[in-house]
Amino acid sequence: MSGDNGGGERRKGSVKWFDTQKGFGFITPDDGGDDLFVHQSSIRSEGFRSLAAEEAVEFEVEIDNNNRPKAIDVSGPDGAPVQGNSGGGSSGGRGGFGGGRGGGRGSGGGYGGGGGGYGGRGGGGRGGSDCYKCGEPGHMARDCSEGGGGYGGGGGGYGGGGGYGGGGGGYGGGGRGGGGGGGSCYSCGESGHFARDCTSGGR
């Protein structure tokens, strides 16, 4: 009980509440007395400084400039780092506040995120200069010599990679593509002609 790191006497208590967003809360001392104010700068932690409600803590008491007692050098039992609100809980901890930020714009779904939605990967098929099949500049997917294409090859679906949005984003995204922007033969999978002109005997 007298692990005196800061010269004062270590006391024990439990966290009454702690607002992670605002960075402060109160501790109820085990030996009675008034609840003590605690600021996140007084927390001994590995990483994000927060406290979980009802968490057992040890601390020292200091009188602040307004002559009020406050808890400082707050740690877990036996001087261990506090557990805190590292996963969420009341307003957030590490993730919480804006955590995961994936929904709306960017980051996955929505407008222009990494793959889905309107802009998707290739800028929504808005005439970029790189081939959707192989990623090389200088030619379009329909003229690409790399395999793919065909009924489900390459980007999957009818036109595999070619077409409106090509491999990933945009309108036709890998799936329907084809039709609208050239693409490959449905019968043999080769580019440069349509199924009705195919000489490979598919139909």
Curated annotation (Swiss-Prot):
Keyword vocabulary terms for this entry: Acetylation, Chaperone, Cytoplasm, DNA-binding, Metal-binding, Nucleus, Repeat, RNA-binding, Zinc, Zinc-finger
InterPro entries membership: CSD, CSD_CS, CSP_DNA-bd, NA-bd_OB-fold, Znf_CCHC, Znf_CCHC_sf
SMART domains the UniProt entry points to: CSP (SM00357), ZnF_C2HC (SM00343)
Subcellular location: Cytoplasm; Nucleus, Nucleolus
Record's note on what induces expression: Induced by abscisic acid (ABA), transiently by ethylene, salicylic acid and water fload, but down-regulated by dehydration stress. Accumulates during cold acclimation. Accumulation during silique development is AGL15-dependent.
Tissue-specific expression: Mostly expressed in shoot apices, seeds and siliques, and, to a lower extent, in roots, cotyledons, stems, shoots, leaves, floral buds and flowers. Present in shoot apical meristems and siliques (at protein level).
ZnF region ranges: CCHC-type: 129-146, 183-200
Molecular function in Gene Ontology: double-stranded DNA binding; mRNA binding; nucleic acid binding; single-stranded DNA binding; zinc ion binding
Protein's GO biological process: cold acclimation; regulation of cellular respiration; response to abscisic acid; response to cold; response to desiccation; response to water deprivation; seed development; stamen development
Observed effect of gene inactivation: Early flowering, altered stamen number and impaired seed development.
Stretches assigned to the CSD domain: 12-76
Record's keyword annotation contains tRNA processing: no
A Gene Ontology cellular-component term: nucleolus
Sites bearing N-acetylserine, chain numbering: 2
Recorded family membership: Belongs to the cold shock protein (CSP) family.
Function (record text): Chaperone that binds to RNA, single- (ssDNA) and double-stranded (dsDNA) DNA, and unwinds nucleic acid duplex. Accelerates seed germination and seedling growth under cold stress, and contributes to enhancement of cold and freezing tolerance. Regulates flowering transition, and flower and seed development. Promotes seed germination under salt stress. May regulate respiratory oxygen uptake.
UniProt name for this protein: Cold shock protein 2
The species this protein was found in: Arabidopsis thaliana (Mouse-ear cress)
